[in-house]
Structure formats: structure tokens, C-alpha cells
Regions:
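Asp-based, Mg2+/Mn2+-dependent phosphohydrolase catalytic module
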Residues: 1-5, 18, 33, 110-117, ...
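N-terminal helical cap/lid subdomain that shapes the substrate entry/recognition surface
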Residues: 2-107, 119
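Conserved phosphate-coupling serine/threonine residues in phosphotransfer and NTP-handling enzymes
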Residues: 12, 127-129
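Residues that cap or flank secondary-structure elements
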Residues: 60, 64, 104, 126, ...
């Protein structure tokens, strides 16, 4: 029986394109200017931006800032990797402050999470974002009273799809993998569910992933609202 719902954030609870796409492209352009990188298209493709689209499996859609830093260090042709890292981290902070991206959530997201809570489910967010970004989302989205925990890429050094990312979570809440459903929009989310042997692995089409990207999921739904509507299909409570 499923008791815990682990929701990915960007693309699952949050509309990725409307929130992060502009900043993602500005970061690339600023890096190219700063380090005089000539292969713009090649860099974009390495980061998962191809033919004007964010790839579901790409770093920009499902990776961390640390992943971006590593790609920048590779492409900067600069001896001082620490300088590239510091510059990228500071740029990310500056752009978030400058653009102040609006938190655009999936339609009816708050009500759907509340319906799950009313039915007795516990809810966590599992994300490649850091703690600060995740807390900001929870506050801006007005769902702090609905979220029981957050599992982020910075809490223990592991990130999706590494199952070690959730080991502390199991101990904290005395929960086993079979009681957990993970819901996400990228192949990384699906692989996280498989690697961790979660009870149910769900793909949603509200983010960057297409149906073909999520074929390893147990179920694929339009969004979290359809996931709620089809509860009897994935959980025999």
C-alpha cells in the first residue's frame, strides 16, 4: 500500500518553461561571453538544449547547478576550475535575484495536494534543486502546510537517480520503498524510482518529458491532477 508520495518539483509541480527556461538560456549566454566560448551550439546540446527544446534527460531540465558547473569547467579552457565554479554560482544567484522568476505551478496543484493530504497520504518533494530553491518554491506556491519533507540534491551529497539520496529519508520516517510512489516528468525521475525499488513509479507529461521518455514508468498521466483522479488504478487502498 502506498503511503508516501514523492513529487519531483520542476515540470511536475512547477511549470518548467514558464519559470526557468529564460534564466537557463541567459546563464549559457553569459558564460559564452565571459569565457569566449566559440562552440555555442555544442555547449547548448551538452546541457540538454537542442533545436529550441529542453531535453527531458538533459542537465538543464533534470540536473543540478553542480552539473552545469562541471560542463562550464570543461568548456571554459580555463586553468582555474574554482574560479569558474565561483563565477557560475554567483551568476546563478544574481540572475535569480534580477529576474525573480515567478513560481508558475501546475494548474490546480494546491487543491490536488490537499486532496491527497485529506486522504491520509504524506507528501515529500524530491528534487535536483538545492534546499534554498526548494524552500522558496514551497513558500511562493503556498503549500508549506501540505509538504511533510524535502529531499534535495544538497542534503547528503547524492542526487537522482542514486538510491542513496533517500536512505536518510527511510530512517527518518520509518518507511520502506514499497510504501512510496514517485511522480516525475523526466527519465531521471523514473530511473530514481526503479533504482530505489519504489512501490509505484509514475511519469507525468506536464514537463519536459514526452511519453517515449517515460516508458519505463508503471503509469503515465497527463499531470498530477490525472494522477489523483486515477488513484484506484495505482493504489489499492
Amino acid at each position: 500500500m502506498i503511503n508516501w508520495l514523492l513529487f519531483d518539483k520542476d515540470g511536475t509541480l512547477l511549470k518548467f518553461d514558464e519559470t526557468w527556461s529564460e534564466i537557463s538560456l541567459v546563464i549559457i549566454n553569459k558564460f559564452i561571453e565571459q569565457y569566449q566560448v566559440e562552440e555555442e551550439q555544442s555547449l547548448q546540446e551538452e546541457l540538454g538544449y537542442v533545436d529550441g527544446k529542453f531535453l527531458a534527460s538533459g542537465i538543464l531540465a533534470s540536473g543540478t547547478l553542480s552539473d552545469i558547473v562541471k560542463k562550464f569547467q570543461k568548456n571554459a579552457n580555463h586553468e582555474n576550475n574554482k574560479e569558474v565554479e565561483d563565477w557560475t554560482i554567483q551568476l546563478s544567484k544574481d540572475l535569480i535575484a534580477e529576474y525573480n522568476p515567478e513560481t508558475v505551478v501546475i494548474d490546480d496543484m494546491q487543491n490536488t495536494l490537499k486532496h491527497f493530504k485529506d486522504k491520509g497520504y504524506q507528501i515529500a518533494i524530491i528534487t535536483s534543486d538545492d534546499q534554498d530553491g526548494t524552500k522558496r518554491f514551497i513558500k511562493d506556491a503556498g503549500v508549506s502546510h501540505l509538504i511533510d519533507d524535502t529531499i534535495t540534491a544538497t542534503i547528503n551529497g547524492y542526487q537522482k537517480p542514486d538510491p542513496k539520496m533517500v536512505e536518510d529519508f527511510y530512517a527518518k520516517w520509518n518507511v520502506v520503498p514499497e510504501e512510496i510512489a514517485i511522480i516525475g516528468d523526466t527519465p531521471t525521475d523514473i530511473q530514481m524510482g526503479r533504482n530505489s525499488h519504489f512501490g509505484v513509479v509514475v511519469g507525468v507529461l506536464s514537463g519536459t518529458g514526452e511519453k517515449s521518455d517515460l516508458e519505463e514508468a508503471d503509469y503515465i498521466y497527463k499531470d498530477i491532477n490525472e494522477f489523483y483522479e486515477k488513484e484506484t488504478e495505482w493504489n489499492g487502498r
